[in-house]
Amino acid sequence: MRSFFLLFFLIFSYGSAGAENLKPSRGIIATSNPYASEAAYEIIKKGGNAIDASIAVQLVLTLTEPQATGIGGGAFMLYWDTDKAKLFSIDGREKAPSKAGEDLFLNKDGTKIKFYPDAVVGAKSVGVPGIIKLLEEAHKKFGKLEWAELFDYAIELSKNGFLISPALHNTLGYLNYLKTVEPAASLYYEENLKGEKIPLPVGYILKNEEYAKTLKRISLLGAKEFYEGKTAELIIQSLRDADKNSLMSLDDLKNYQIVWREPLCGLYRSYNVCSMPPPSSGGLTMLMMLKILEDFDIQKLDPESREMVHLFSEVSRLAYADRAYYMADPDFINIPSEELLNDKYIDKRRMLIDLNKAAKTVKNGNPFENIDFGKNVDISKPSTSHFVIIDEEGNAVSMTSTVEGPFGSHLMAGGFILNNELTDFSLMPEIDGKKVANRVEGNKRPMSSMTPTIIFKNGEVYALTGSPGGTSIINYVTKSVIGLLDW
């Protein structure tokens, strides 16, 4: 947990003093990539706000962190509007194509197909992307600068090239199937003297002209171009080339809509901790963990002690057990959010914890009657990107975006990676005769673990946090919250 405080200090030091002319009072920028941070800084310098800067960041991350995120994927955004004193949550999660059915990841005998590469690589795993729609809708409602201006940095960087990072290079090194999928193989690998494909080296200047063209079209024509124009056609063509029976259609792209959802908030140690509601499982699972932990005097425990590690592990197991059964797309499933956070239910779950030994098995609870789902069966590989921005007016963004696994489906269109988000659904639609809440259904959003979070104290923004990491995201963010508020 001490490493968390070091990270917290570095992030906020960079945001307040890392840019030459950016005074502490003018804003905070914390991203996973220096190019993205610079793009955001340039927007803030021009008078843009947190939303404007977020758009610039995401467009650059698509280029520089294709292994983790991109406009071919989805995102959740929390936005604090300081003038309105209101928190907004925007759901830009991908959706399953309308023709997708619960047997999407099943063999003919009803068993689940092999996860990698069968389920991941190719058209089968690709959901309808949501990021561009999210960014445009946020900009229409809150942005200050012109839409096209927010694309300039990413377009120029795509044309002139960026330095391959160690993170990108290392990911390329272990994805054997990516070497066989074009155009990604030709873009991110080179041949050695033996004719073997090897990752481009750290520091190599990589240009992406196709992505520059895509950004230029969207900058001029807006999200409509992505969902109905040439970019939409390129997406469908890429899927058809990979699988002639690909399920996604132009209508699926055209009909995609984001959802403005009510933020999910709860008190912890007198602070108001807010995150995303379902289809993210992050906010609900984190708040369950915090409510269970609040009854323990963990401030007296060493963060790295055996007692604290044991307690956190047991709390996490209890919350994740409920997550596996009850969380999914709320537009399809009645999720017992209030019941899962009910004090009496939390007390029952807390009483299952033995401070001296780990439970042999942890079962889901029963938050209310007449709810009976099978256990979610999915495999999530660590990926994703998170960033936070506060502008000089105090507006704040906490946003997590992803293409799901490393390099998503491995397919590309218009210079960007297409997600493999549908593997976030349960691979098995039914367990022991019970339907799984997070099963595949047409137009449904898969459950996510992304947990963008904003913490408030006395009605004002106190801290912003979030993380990459697949299903471990929830644990990471919960640890950062208790690290900040308890220690």
Predicted regions mapped to residue ranges:
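Glycine-rich phosphate/pyrophosphate-binding beta-alpha loops
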Residues: 274-283, 384-388, 398-410, 466-474
